């Protein structure tokens, strides 16, 4: 074979390999863009991933509202490995099981949200699916151009990530996990693990919960907690109008803000961050332990020093006192 023939063969092989690579990458991008969740769980890419290679196929069914529901008889943990993903989950009315629905799913940087049939997060009432509804008419030129731009951008990020790996400086895109709970249900045995995201719990009662948020923001609004552990690493935790009963709220390096009532002995704390707590009424005989570590503690807008016998005004008729026991600040309302 002469040099020209060899060169021609090499060129053909290179073009073929490049075409196959482009088809693979573009196919992966389109799979993400379609939001094809059922294929996403069982795709060869997921099966090759070492973290999921041993997991069985998850059995699902579709309810009347179009939600993909997890079969409660198979409570395997599901990992959504994607980014800019907005997940809406509710309890399916048919089998009282967990449902999930990916509303938006594109492929920037990897992020894992762990879901299992005992995990219900966010808000009571109706579904909070936040997806843009397409216009009744055909899309205009501008919308078509935006769609093409988004497709090319997702394809580029897929190509960049698959070829060069995640070590080349991808920025983390925060996401928000949205999970719905019917108004008549409370949440028991809640287990949540989130990373680089914003997690909100609103207007629900959680019991026996274990929530861990890494480099994330945790917001609780009108939540009643009973024997619950909420822990964040770098992010901030906000607990507004919360009712604590045997609850433990921690943040390693962030800011922990709390205002609400106590219905059981509870603990809030930080290692090197800041604790801001506010109470307005007498909370019976229940006490709140504050672990401040090397951080700062503010109660009712006053800096609390680690001294004995500190009492603060609540703005009402009650008085709030802080007791130091071996470095732990115990907040209580004296009888």
From Swiss-Prot:
It holds the Pfam family DUF4097. It comes from the Bacteria. One of its GO terms (cellular component) is plasma membrane. A lipid is attached at residue 22 (S-diacylglycerol cysteine). A lipid is attached at residue 22 (N-palmitoyl cysteine). It is found in: Cell membrane. Keywords: Cell membrane, Lipoprotein, Membrane, Palmitate, Signal. The keyword Transcription regulation does not apply. It is a lipid-anchor. Its main location: membrane. Residues 1-21 form the signal peptide. This is Uncharacterized lipoprotein TP_0839. It comes from Treponema pallidum (strain Nichols).
